[in-house]
Every structure is written in structure tokens, then in C-alpha cells.
């Protein structure tokens, strides 16, 4: 069986030979900005031209937002759906490209569009399903919130329950992150529906706990390291170093995102016997 270290090394070589794997993430970034336009439109609808903002007090601002609550709700809902749709299409596209690169050594933009169109709807529904599964953990916060006095005042029993709820929610979210780690990869690689992809991810984790945990920790460590570098640079007083924070963002889009997609795709394909060079048979 291919070790995680070998998987990371071979995945890196595949990414190095297919630098076009960053294209889905570039398109996703650009279109995600456009998807925020409904919120910008709601802002201008509520407050008018930017030059009028200096004359608006915080009380007036809150009153205007309350008066346009339906507009803001519709704008946030529309933007959320657009962002989810963009993410779903290009996540499927990126995984499709990664799978083709792992199988044949070369991925093309045609693979990107084909995978995105084929798996868009299932990926969109899977994103909503997994999102609700994570949000369901907020039930741990309800007892503490219910006991908080109105108006808000620190109350030991309520604060204790709230802190306990936050800890439980974090543990729940962490568990779900591991259990659902390969949902998009199972969905695209095995051409599954959203529910079957969730069950496949849970089953995959049961048989590959250590590998999933190690790769998850590696990806999180690299991501946090990159964010810490960007944060440290942004907090610096020397203005000449400010562009470096933008460089870390580009590294995330151009390098880290496609590279981790190759790693996760290779892990799923190798452990389910879909890579000819892995020597692994389907454990199920």
C-alpha cells in the first residue's frame, strides 16, 4: 500500500507537470467576487452614493438596514447560492482534472469543463447537505444561549453552558471535517449522488482513519503556516512588505489549492484501487 509520504511526493510531481491545475481555482476566485455583487447592490440601495456615508450616524445606519431587511436577506441568500454554485462547479472541475492527471499524467482544460458540467448539480447539493450537517452542531450552543439573561449580562451558569457548547461544537465540527473529508472526491471519482458520496466518505474514513488524519493535519498545517506568514507580513509597519501578503494569497490559489486537491484525489483513488500504479485493490 502506498504510504502517505510517497503519496505526497508523487502528488507533487503530478502537480508540477500539470500547472494548469490552478485554473479552476483562478476562475472560482474571480467569479466568487462577482457573486458578491448582490450584497454590493443592497449596500447602494440602502445607503446611496458613497459620499453620503460621512453624514450618516451609526443609529441612522442601523435604521436604514432594518428598513431594508428583506433586500439584505435576499442579497445574502442570492450571494450564498451563487458562491456555493461557483464553488461546486470548480471543485468538481479541479477534482476531475486531478483524476485525469493521476491516470494519464496530463490534464487539459477540456477535462475541467467536462467534469464541472457533469458533476455540478450533485456537488452543489452535496455542498448544501454537508453544510447543514455541520451547522446542525450548533444545537450544542442552544442551552447556554437560552439561559443568557436579557439584556445580556454575564451569568456564571449560562456562560459555563455556553463555553461547554462551544467546545462540543468545535469537536463536532472537527469530527465532521474528518468524516466528510473525501465527499467531493468520492462524488466525482465514483460518479455518486450527494447522499451516497457522504456514506462513501464515512466508509472510507472507517478503513483509512490514519491516512485521512495525517493528510488532513498536513494540509491544515501548511494552510495555517501560509496564513501566519501573510498575517505577520500584513501586520508589519514597513509598507514595502505589504505586497507580500498578496503573494501568500496567490500561493494559496496557484499552488496550495491544486496541490492539496491532487493529494486528496490520489489518496481516494489509491485506497480504492483506481490507480494502476498503486497496487491496491478495493478494500470493500
Locations of regions flagged by a protein language model:
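N-terminal juxtamembrane cytosolic/stromal segments of multi-pass membrane proteins
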Residues: 1-23, 106-115, 283-284
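Juxtamembrane transition segments at transmembrane-helix termini in multipass membrane proteins
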Residues: 6-8, 26-27, 31-32, 43-70, ...
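Membrane-interface helix starts
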Residues: 12-27, 117-128, 206-217
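Hydrophobic alpha-helical transmembrane segments
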Residues: 22-23, 73-78, 123-125, 163-168, ...
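Long, highly hydrophobic alpha-helical transmembrane signal-anchor segments
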Residues: 42-73, 134-162
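Alpha-helical membrane-spanning segments of integral membrane proteins, especially the hydrophobic core
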Residues: 72, 76, 107-135, 157-170
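Alpha-helical transmembrane segments
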Residues: 72-87, 161-175, 249, 253
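Membrane-interfacial helix-loop-helix connectors in multipass membrane proteins
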Residues: 144-167, 232-247
Amino acid at each position: 500500500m502506498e504510504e502517505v509520504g510517497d503519496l505526497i511526493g508523487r502528488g507533487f510531481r503530478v502537480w508540477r507537470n500539470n500547472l494548469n491545475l490552478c485554473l479552476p481555482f483562478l476562475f472560482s476566485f474571480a467569479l466568487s467576487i462577482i457573486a458578491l455583487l448582490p450584497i454590493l447592490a443592497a449596500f447602494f440601495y440602502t445607503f446611496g452614493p458613497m459620499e453620503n456615508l460621512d453624514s450618516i450616524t451609526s443609529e441612522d445606519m442601523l435604521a436604514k438596514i432594518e428598513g431594508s431587511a428583506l433586500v439584505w436577506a435576499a442579497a445574502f441568500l442570492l450571494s450564498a447560492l451563487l458562491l456555493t454554485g461557483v464553488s461546486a462547479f470548480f471543485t468538481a472541475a479541479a477534482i476531475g482534472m486531478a483524476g485525469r492527471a493521476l491516470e494519464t499524467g496530463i490534464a487539459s482544460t477540456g477535462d475541467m469543463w467536462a467534469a464541472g458540467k457533469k458533476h455540478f448539480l450533485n456537488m452543489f447539493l452535496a455542498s448544501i447537505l454537508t453544510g447543514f450537517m455541520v451547522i446542525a452542531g450548533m444545537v450544542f450552543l442552544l442551552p447556554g444561549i437560552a439561559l443568557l439573561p436579557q439584556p445580556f449580562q454575564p451569568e456564571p451558569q449560562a456562560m459555563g453552558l455556553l463555553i461547554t457548547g462551544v467546545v462540543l461544537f468545535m469537536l463536532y465540527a472537527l469530527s465532521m471535517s474528518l468524516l466528510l473529508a473525501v465527499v467531493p472526491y468520492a462524488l466525482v471519482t465514483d460518479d455518486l449522488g450527494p447522499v451516497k458520496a457522504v456514506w462513501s466518505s464515512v466508509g472510507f474514513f472507517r478503513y483509512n482513519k490514519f491516512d485521512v488524519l495525517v493528510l488532513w493535519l498536513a494540509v491544515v498545517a501548511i494552510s495555517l503556516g501560509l496564513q501566519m506568514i501573510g498575517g505577520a507580513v500584513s501586520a508589519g509597519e514597513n509598507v514595502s512588505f505589504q505586497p507580500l501578503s498578496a503573494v501568500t494569497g496567490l500561493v494559496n490559489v496557484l499552488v496550495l489549492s491544486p496541490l492539496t486537491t491532487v493529494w486528496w484525489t490520489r489518496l481516494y483513488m489509491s485506497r480504492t484501487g483506481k490507480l494502476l500504479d498503486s497496487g491496491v485493490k478495493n478494500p470493500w
